[in-house]
Amino acid sequence: MVALHERGTAEAKKDKPRPSAAKSPSPSATRRPLERIQSGTPQLTQAMPPRLLYGLPAVGNTVALTIDDGVSSDVVAAYLDFIQRTGVRVTFFPNGVYPSWTQHAPTLRPLVDSGQVQLGNHTWSHPDLVTLSDSAVVDQLSRNEKFLWNTFGVTARPFFRPPYGSRDARVDQLAADQGYWVSTMWNGTFGDSDLLTPAQVLANAKQWLIAHHVVIGHANYPTVTHVFNELADLIRSRRLVTVTLNDVFNTT
């Protein structure tokens, strides 16, 4: 198995352009109605998060689904429907530059208010932070923080995810100075930062959707929406408990 930091870096460094809308099949209804697989807030003993977070504590059968970007309004809508129907708990890392988050705020905000969905900071427009000046890094984080507060009434602190997983000690410190002291990486992936087939997304999910993993996905290409039934089946058959980062970690 690929080491945690290597897995994050391998996917992160594939390409640098900001995610953009793709010409690919539109999201469609899943083959059968999605069924609820989880209800309520998991009762967990919370731990302090590390400053560099890759996975979850080895307690229980928890898994964290973390979904980035939001290029496609249709995919964001499909994810929200998946969350509402199944009861899964998800942490989104939005880029506020994408209109999808404003468009779907009426649906998303109640899920945020209930705690079923958490929001983290993924910067305003998805640049490689390592290449930016100090002031530009701060602007990317603060602008997105302001957007999340004004739109959803919550702060994303202390969790931020650097675009492409590209970070260094300088970026980490600048983020921490803004209250973002947990650089949130991952140790599992759907691999869908690129356009994959449904079979490829599902194969990645089968490999990485396991206990104690922080799994990264993207609300960009619609491919993942065609395997929502299979993802729900995996969670159910493996007796996984989906969690937000706030469910697991005490940051107060």
Where are these regions (language model features)?
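Structural recognition of the beta-strand scaffold that forms the well-ordered cores
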Residues: 63-66, 90-94, 118-121, 158-162, ...
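N-terminal twin-arginine translocation
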Residues: 1-17, 22
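C-terminal domain-boundary segment and adjacent tail
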Residues: 48, 52-58, 100, 223-252
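A short acidic, amphipathic alpha-helical/loop segment
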Residues: 78-82, 106-108, 170-174, 227-231
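CE4/NodB-like, metal-dependent polysaccharide N-deacetylase domain
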Residues: 84-91, 118, 134-168, 202-217, ...
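His/Asp/Glu-enriched short active-site or ligand-binding loop at hydrolase and phosphoryl-transfer sites
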Residues: 166-208, 240-251
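Extracytoplasmic/secreted cell-surface and envelope-processing proteins
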Residues: 74-75, 101-102, 127-131, 167-171, ...
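Active-site beta->alpha N-cap acidic-glycine motif
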Residues: 29-128, 136, 140, 147, ...
